Amino acid sequence: MEYKIVNLSQKPEILDRAARWFHEKWEVPLEAYRESMEESLLKKAPVPQWYLALKDSEIIGGMGVIENDFHHRKDLAPNVCAVYTEADYRNHGVAGALLDYVCRDMKEKGIDTLYLITDHTSFYERYGWEFYCMVQGDGEPQMSRMYIHRG
């Protein structure tokens, strides 16, 4: 299966479509995605960044890098967020390829350490991530797993 991974800055014309795609997957307000993506295009700082896996023009996967993914440990930053692969494309290495691309891209931008929150217990280890600690999500009753990736 052929697909291409891009930073949104390489295809700014799909910003609105990308914001809607993430909004539909995660139910975070559309405007929050749009604002973060617009900020990423200004290139004033390495964070935020948004990445997409594209099969032709279809978005089949994506993720972002933001300062804080809605948790109380503001010192654990930046965070990979909104990791999602369309169901028809799971188990084809899309998320792993996105993670590798994001880690390399952020390292080129001077950021060696990334964090992410997940409920998954074995997926991210395959890609060099390590369990770091439990964190309290904003408004969440349960603690969540925080992973770290050191470049």
Feature names for model-found ranges:
Residues M1-M37, A45, W50, L54, ...:
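Short amphipathic alpha-helix that is part of the acyltransferase structural core
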Residues P48, P141-M146:
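Short hydrophobic/aromatic beta-strand or adjacent loop that forms the aromatic wall/cage
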Residues L52, E58-N68, N79, Y84:
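Conserved beta-strand in the GNAT
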Residues N68-F70, D88, T121:
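Short coil/turn motifs at secondary-structure junctions
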Residues T85, N91-R104:
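Conserved acetyl-CoA-binding loop-helix of GNAT-fold acetyltransferases
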Residues E108, D112, T118-Q142:
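Conserved active-site alpha-helix within GNAT-family acetyltransferase domains
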